[in-house]
């Protein structure tokens, strides 16, 4: 079932003929359950599992509330007000849409899987594959969108004299972000299966996750390393280089000529934007690096976790850290990066105060601005 980005293999004392369980990128495997099938004990009834269930339940509720409400506010404000539609915000909208879909579609099913039915899937194979697939696509859309934002900021700040990305190019880039994510995620749906596990006597759990055939283990590991390279290492390295050059340009390079108040405001605005984006990059690395590291050790050095009592607890802790990344993105983009809440409050006031018919308010005029929205810097200065 969908959890966060990872993969898995069977423990040494349990296997199914002709199959090798994996979960790239959003699944548990049989050993993730930490269920010793040769003992008369249901590990889902232990205190360790109970604590882990509470932790992941709280995390899922947090994602549903934060990402569901926060991204809805951002998307609604962006749709209504053209002043918010600069190129950076349009790229951010991809993260908002993907996280919003996960919050309202995937998380309720995950809550049922982890907390209500305690690692047992009750919704059929089609939904099992769809939820895993949507989770995977969402992760890669977020990663690719963050990379696109970093490159856009790099070109705008380090090479200001070069032509800026126009909306045709931005539309192509957004389509590319989704297309790459959709294609790379296909194996997560293709290899997703339901498998019945008998835990204690006649008690059963229905496992939902990717199951790769034994004779395709090499393909699985190659696929994981490919995804790890182009969806984590590559983007993180590129974004780090971009923000390093941007930081040098904004903080360590003298601005020639006389600095007007408008120039100083634009510089402060750019610095604020870049600081938020660097914080988001840092959060992305801190949240996902432990999970990728855990996954690599589990799949490429499986003996490390053999006989490990607290394997399940460690897996849940690492998973919850990874899951929190979407909440951090939402909080940063909605409450810090943009004036989204200001525009959303405007929209609510317009809805609940119909008495403004006689005169056009500034909020009304926002809807009738030019088709060419203000750049991020001009918009930032105007909102000061």
Curated annotation (Swiss-Prot):
It comes from Bos taurus (Bovine). Receptor for prokineticin 2. Exclusively coupled to the G(q) subclass of heteromeric G proteins. Activation leads to mobilization of calcium, stimulation of phosphoinositide turnover and activation of p44/p42 mitogen-activated protein kinase. The chain crosses the membrane at residues 54-74, 90-110, 138-158, 172-192, 224-244, 274-294, 314-334. The lineage of its organism: Eukaryota, Metazoa, Chordata, Craniata, Vertebrata. The keyword Transcription regulation does not apply. InterPro entries: GPCR_Rhodpsn, GPCR_Rhodpsn_7TM, NPY_rcpt. It is found in: Cell membrane. This is Prokineticin receptor 2. The keyword Nucleotidyltransferase does not apply.
């Amino acid at each position: 079932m969908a959890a966060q980005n990872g993969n898995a293999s069977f423990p040494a004392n349990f296997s199914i003929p002709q199959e090798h369980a994996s979960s790239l990128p959003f699944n548990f495997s049989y050993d993730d359950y930490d269920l010793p099938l040769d003992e008369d004990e249901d590990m889902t009834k232990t205190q360790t599992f109970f604590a882990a269930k509470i932790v992941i339940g709280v995390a899922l509720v947090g994602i549903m509330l934060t990402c569901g409400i926060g991204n809805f506010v951002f998307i609604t404000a962006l749709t209504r007000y053209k002043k918010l539609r600069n190129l950076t915000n349009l790229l951010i909208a991809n993260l908002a849409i993907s996280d919003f879909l996960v919050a309202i579609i995937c998380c309720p099913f995950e809550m049922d899987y982890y907390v209500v039915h305690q690692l047992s899937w009750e919704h059929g194979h089609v939904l099992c594959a769809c939820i895993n697939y949507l989770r995977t696509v969402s992760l890669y859309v977020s990663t690719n969108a963050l990379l696109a934002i970093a490159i856009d900021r790099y070109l705008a700040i380090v090479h200001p004299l070069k032509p800026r990305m126009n909306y045709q190019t931005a539309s192509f880039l957004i389509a590319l972000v989704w297309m790459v994510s959709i294609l790379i995620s296909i194996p997560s749906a293709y290899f997703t299966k339901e498998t019945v596990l008998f835990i204690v006597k006649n008690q059963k759990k229905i496992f939902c996750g990717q199951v790769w055939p034994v004779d395709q283990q090499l393909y699985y590991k190659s696929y994981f390393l490919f995804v790890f390279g182009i969806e984590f290492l590559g983007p993180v390295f590129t974004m780090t280089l971009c923000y390093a050059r941007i930081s040098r340009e904004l903080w360590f390079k003298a601005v020639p000529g006389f600095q007007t108040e408008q120039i100083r405001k634009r510089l402060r605005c750019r610095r604020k934007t870049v600081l938020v984006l660097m914080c988001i990059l840092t959060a992305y690395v801190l949240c996902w690096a432990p999970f990728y590291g855990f996954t690599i050790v589990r799949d490429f050095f499986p003996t490390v976790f053999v006989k490990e009592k607290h394997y399940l607890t460690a897996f849940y802790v690492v998973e919850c850290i990874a899951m929190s990344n979407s909440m951090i993105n939402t909080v940063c983009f909605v409450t810090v990066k943009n004036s989204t809440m200001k525009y959303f409050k405007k929209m609510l006031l317009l809805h609940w105060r119909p008495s403004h018919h006689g005169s056009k308010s500034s909020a009304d005029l926002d809807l009738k601005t030019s088709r060419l929205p203000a750049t991020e810097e001009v918009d930032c200065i105007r909102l000061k």
